[in-house]
Amino acid sequence: MLGKDLLGLYDASVEDIMLILDTAVGMKKLLTQNLKKLPHLQGRTVTTLFYENSTRTRCSFELAAKYLGAGTVNISASSSSVQKGETLIDTGYTLDAMKNDVIVIRHPMGGAPHLLAKHVKASVVNGGDGMNEHPTQALLDFYTMREKFGSFKGLKVAILGDIKHSRVAKSNLFGLTKLGAEVVMYSPATLMPQGVERMGAKVARSREEALAGANVVMGLRIQLERMHGGLFPSLSEYAKYYGVGEEHLKYADKDCIVMHPGPVNRGVELTSDVIDADNSKITEQVLNGVAVRMALLFLLVKNRQGGEKNE
């Protein structure tokens, strides 16, 4: 049973993951029918508390909450009392006193959502914490895969890019291995974290090996903002040896799909012809993200304290 919070997929059960995905199916049907003002969370409040920049995640959560009838509050660290020295815990106490029902937090420090969840009555959702996890991105990725293939059993998911700094890669790895998929990772050695094989991933020795027979090809952004020092010679060198172009997809399964959590560096992780091809699901991922986050917000509020408000 889904608990009070969603802090990561490392300790999430298969049952919880499938519950969210199953609920999201109905939410997407409502979205595609243009039913964007539902009463499910009427009278509830969802706050996004972001200490890092975001377009997709923040907007997706805000729309998900509004489509379900909830009120929304957006807080950026740059324009809040954080600039005056307020701690995360004190910010949490303040938001709790205002009777928020759900707090979606993005923070540069790994573990920040877990810390916040220990000090507030509101449900806490991890919208990305440092290089740790990004569970809702992985959930929308799973939804996109299942929508195409129907099941995860036997799927080969190739993840190429900046694995070391990617919270998306970690959440995908944690969830996909539980769901029965094979995860293969490929990146420069300087961008491959230690221990991923112990977590269930296979590390490919070449781009061709990573892509061979892959059902899903997922590119990851080079996170220059998290890098200190030269981890590879140049973006052009990276694109030449690690990027994915149309000519490389001949190694993948003929019915493969291409995914990317965004934002995409065109011509670096993926070429434009790959991004814009018919088998690219990058735009569909964005729509699926709204449906998945609608499902998550609905389930968290429903399950917490029997559906009672934070009063």
Predicted regions and their residues:
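Positively charged, low-complexity intrinsically disordered leader regions
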Residues: 1-59, 63
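Phosphate/diphosphate ligand-binding glycine-rich loop within oxidoreductases
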Residues: 35, 39-143, 266
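Phosphate-coordination loops involved in phosphoryl transfer and adenosine-cofactor binding
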Residues: 41-46, 153-157, 255
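Short, structured coil segments at secondary-structure junctions
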Residues: 68, 119-121, 179, 197-200, ...
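Rossmann-like adenosine-cofactor binding region
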Residues: 196-273
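Adenosine-phosphate binding glycine-rich loop
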Residues: 255-256, 261-311
